[in-house]
Amino acid sequence: PASPKIFHGRETELEHLVDNLLSDPARVAILGPGGIGKTTLVVTALHSTRVVEKYPTRYFIPCDSVQTINSLVATIASHLSLEGSKSSMRHIIHHLTMQPLTLLILDNFETPWEPADGRVKIEEFLALLTDIRHVALLITMRGAERPSKVQWTHPFLHPLSPLSPDAAHQTFIEIADEIHDALEVGQLLEITDNIPLAVQLVANIAASEGCQATLERWKVETTALLSAGNDKQSNLEISIKLSLSSPRMASIPPAVDLLGLLSLLSDGISETDLLQSKPAIPEIAGCKTTLLCTSLAFIDHAGRLKVLAPIRDYVQTTIPPSPHLVRPLRKYFNDL
């Protein structure tokens, strides 16, 4: 893929990633919620002069349509130009062993890794790939958890966070120009919570319709306004739905109930308040862990459990919490 033309606010992460890729052997995982800019960061690093100089052979392999170990092997083999009888796991390992220094990027690796019934085989295959010392492995994954059986390069990159306000503003004006009212731009960026995908989508609309019209549309359409595209790179709702429909979320259905409650709390909730409010949600600790592992929620600097604004808006619109779940929480806060 081509190098991103708009890239603001990830300079520290980029330097950290490139430094990790220059170590031997490099095994790096980029984590974070959907739309946070994982792929953009990786592609920018892929075009870094230092990375290009070190790795004469570089493969970028999308895994978002890969569901099983067999399809993962077939997809990697195809990108390595191994066909027919030479498209097996054994042939992939042999081929990479004979290559010079190689960078192997597996993008959206959560798709094959998430299903619990196939995870062991997926991780065993990753371990085989990392046995080849001159092959650097770089994966991107939704969530906050790295696959096991791989000795990931230290120091780890933290899961990506939203952009800083300045970086989000720079991104916006680079797409929509500087002709807009500063107050209206600020209101639009507040909607996005500085998630890169949301900033990009709202800036594209503002560029053609203006900030005021975009704000008026948001009041009516909410996240549907940012969902005109047909894939998760251009459609915020598709990106959120992918996280909501992950196997991990499906394994603990009450996690959606907790997400619904959190969608009502723009400032999040402390661990103490969450437990003392006694919401009618079974396995609440497991639900919290699930939301954190899928990056549908996060812990802020004050230790509060929170959900990013675009996800809150989507959940309130499409799967709002039922009154019997909200009632204990409302009573608890009213009694404080």
Spell out what each predicted region is.
Residues A198-I252, R330:
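Loop-to-helix "switch" segment enriched in basic
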Residues S85-R90, R119-E123, A182, I281-A285:
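Structural motif corresponding to alpha-helix initiation and N-cap regions
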Residues R10-T12, T40-T44, N70-T75, L103, ...:
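Alpha-helical sensor/transducer elements of the RecA-like P-loop NTPase core
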Residues V42-V43, V185, T192, A203-A207, ...:
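C-terminal boundary/linker of central alpha/beta nucleotide-binding cores
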Residues L14, I93-H94, D107, I122-T130, ...:
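Short amphipathic alpha-helical segments and helix-helix/interface helices
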Residues I61, H158-L160, F333:
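Hydrophobic residues at beta-strand termini and immediately following loops
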Residues D24, I36, T49, H79-E83, ...:
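Phosphate/oxyanion-binding loops and surfaces in catalytic or ligand/nucleic-acid-binding neighborhoods
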